[in-house]
Amino acid sequence: MTIMRKTHPLLKIINHSFIDLPTPSNISSWWNFGSLLGICLIIQILTGLFLAMHYTSDTATAFSSVTHICRDVNYGWLIRYMHANGASMFFICLFIHVGRGIYYGSYMLSETWNIGIILLLTTMATAFVGYVLPWGQMSFWGATVITNLLSAIPYIGTTLVEWIWGGFSVDKATLTRFFAFHFILPFIITAFVLVHLLFLHETGSNNPSGLNSNSDKIPFHPYYTIKDLLGVILLLMVLMILVLFFPDVLGDPDNYTPANPLNTPAHIKPEWYXLFAYAILRSIPNKLGGVLALILSILILAAFPLLNSSKQHGLIYRPISQTLYWIFVSNLLILTWIGGQPVEYPFTVIGQIASILYFAIIIILMPXANMIENNILKLXY
């Protein structure tokens, strides 16, 4: 008698994805972050659903409804802070996941990589519209500043901004539609995640050695289910430490002041996970140029498979590229720091240098390092 999970039409799909999936025997803990992102997405959808039951998307009551959730709803404070800090954990896992993809050359699985870029963009969009919903000062002004960037588009810009706002300023219509977007986008993300997995399972996972692992595969369950479970426990532990001890450490104090169109906060800035892109945007004096740089800061990831000319897969045996990679990571951290600083000397100059370096490493320095390393290989043999 055949096992049901191998014959049942629905269970068969789950079986081929999570149970009998042939997996390289040597993938390290850096490969745990895919499953952690799945857990984060589930946490966000569940907590978000319960928040939506009590939230009202009206400018008069939005701020009060969030306060009501925290004060009057059973464990409302827990759900709210799990959702807010869950987003931060989501982005930490996302950045590590992308970083691992760059380090180990996983971008050569180009369909999976490109769907991943779409996922990153969609997640950032979801986080942005979600940040507007509590209708605090930073919510309102963040929405005003970021949506206003679209006015830089020639000819149709102003019309486009007013169309998104649903009026002549960020107001009730904007909040209502942002709530609608914030509700639907996670389900679109879930659909893209399934496509991401579909493409991944067409080729199989990459592995730290960068070699073909077809000759040495093991079933996903029980080996990697147990391994992923450790990651999940650690993730939940860090999340709960954040939620229960430091719930506001990653937030902005300005968001505890209700939105006031007549009073601009001293420093308008988005959540920490969008700061690197915000720093790149601010470092260009021209408005349209800044918007293009902002979009390119994410889309540049699509250039990795195109610019790669290395004879080796991944950076594990490539010291020059490795050095550049860690400079790139440090540069990203500097950009994140600069994005949260006021627009004044010396922060502006540091931001401009870091922005130039961000693009230069990917477009100029990495390909050049590839060529040098290929030549060193020729000398060796």
Curated annotation (Swiss-Prot):
InterPro entries: Cyt_b/b6_C, Cyt_b/b6_C_sf, Cyt_b/b6_N, Cytb/b6-like_sf, Cytochrome_b, Cytochrome_b_C_euk/bac, Cytochrome_b_N_euk/bac, Di-haem_cyt_TM. Disulfide bonds: none annotated. The chain crosses the membrane at residues 33-53, 77-98, 113-133, 178-198, 226-246, 288-308, 320-340, 347-367. Coiled coil: none annotated. The keyword Metal-binding applies. Heme b b566 binds at H97, H196. One of its GO terms (cellular component) is mitochondrial inner membrane. Keywords: Electron transport, Heme, Iron, Membrane, Metal-binding, Mitochondrion, Mitochondrion inner membrane, Respiratory chain, Transmembrane, Transmembrane helix, Transport, Ubiquinone. It holds the Pfam family Cytochrome_B. Heme b b562 binds at H83, H182. Its cofactor is heme b. A ubiquinone binds at H201. It comes from the Eukaryota. Binds 2 heme b groups non-covalently. It is found in: Mitochondrion inner membrane. Heme 1 (or BL or b562) is low-potential and absorbs at about 562 nm, and heme 2 (or BH or b566) is high-potential and absorbs at about 566 nm. The cytochrome bc1 complex contains 11 subunits: 3 respiratory subunits (MT-CYB, CYC1 and UQCRFS1), 2 core proteins (UQCRC1 and UQCRC2) and 6 low-molecular weight proteins (UQCRH/QCR6, UQCRB/QCR7, UQCRQ/QCR8, UQCR10/QCR9, UQCR11/QCR10 and a cleavage product of UQCRFS1). This cytochrome bc1 complex then forms a dimer. This is Cytochrome b.
